[in-house]
A protein has these predicted regions:
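Alpha-helical segment proximal to the catalytic Tyr-Lys
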Residues: 124, 169-173, 227
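Active-site loop immediately N-terminal to the catalytic Tyr-X3-Lys motif
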Residues: 97, 145-151, 173-174, 206, ...
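C-terminal substrate-recognition "lid" of short-chain dehydrogenase/reductases
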Residues: 210-239
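Active-site helix of classical SDR
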Residues: 119, 156, 164
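Substrate-binding pocket helix/loop in short-chain dehydrogenase/reductase
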Residues: 95-96, 100-108, 191, 199
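Conserved glycine-rich cofactor-binding loop
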Residues: 11-12
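Residue(s) in the substrate-gating loop at a strand-loop-helix junction
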Residues: 140
């Protein structure tokens, strides 16, 4: 039986690329998404057309009860996850004096609270199974060095890094690794409205990253070859930081 991996925000961008790469490597991918059913269905279709295995699991990662119910039911009916990729995230940029409380809360709930909402229902079954496991979180260059106009986003991603390191220490003796991938400027919808020429000049490699390049690192961290790597934050940023 194929190992199963839950990928939150798996319908677009880095999440979609991760789902595609993992399915090509023989994992069964659980594609989480919230609103964009068309994109999720397209991703599922692309995986199946390539001979991979996947299914959809829609829920809001910011909704604690909904996440717990969906994940618990999925584990009880289909079995344990080998890995979880906590990828779903949003941004709502504004200079701090103009940042609304609603946008602060929305970004923290979706990005940081999702760490608890997504992983808390998964960890105890992993421990009880005594089979090890892999947890990968998606942080950001902004979580490492901050970024103007992204106080809320940077706070959420820095929080993910701290939580990742703490959980890694808890789970290491269980052979469950917990690592974070920190992308820089990746060519996804998240940077579509930004001044690309100006941003490109800031990157030592003079180009944006590809979602597949991030996905390749995630796939490695999920593999047996990465069994002795835990509590780490690995950047994919073309030398940006």
């Amino acid at each position: 039986m194929s190992k199963r991996v839950l990928v939150s925000g798996g319908s677009r961008g880095i999440g979609r690329a991760t789902a595609m790469v993992l399915s090509a490597q023989g994992y069964q991918v659980v594609i989480n998404y919230l609103r964009n059913h068309e994109a999720a269905t397209e991703t599922l279709g692309a995986i199946e057309a390539a001979g991979g295995s996947a299914y959809l699991l829609p829920f809001d990662v910011a909704d604690r009860e909904a996440a717990k119910a969906a994940i618990t039911h999925d584990i009880e009916t289909r079995g344990l996850y080998w890995g979880v990729v906590s990828n779903a995230g949003i941004a709502a940029d504004a200079a701090f004096p103009l940042l609304s409380g609603a946008d602060w809360d929305r970004v923290l709930h979706t990005n940081l609270d999702a760490f608890y909402n997504l992983l808390q229902p998964v960890v105890l079954p992993m421990i009880r199974a005594h089979q090890g496991g892999r947890i990968i979180t998606l942080s950001s260059a902004a979580g490492l060095v901050g970024n103007r106009g992204q106080t809320n986003y940077a706070a959420s991603k820095a929080g993910i890094i701290g939580a990742t390191k703490a959980l890694a220490q808890e789970l290491a003796k269980r052979q469950i690794t917990v690592n974070s991938v920190a992308p820089g400027l990746i060519d996804t919808d998240m940077i579509a409205a930004l001044p690309k020429d100006e941003l490109r000049r800031m990157i030592p490699m003079q180009r944006f990253g590809k979602p597949e390049e991030v996905a390749a690192l995630v796939a490695f961290l999920l593999s047996e070859a990465a069994a002795y790597i835990t509590g780490q934050v690995i950047s994919v940023n073309g030398g940006l930081v």
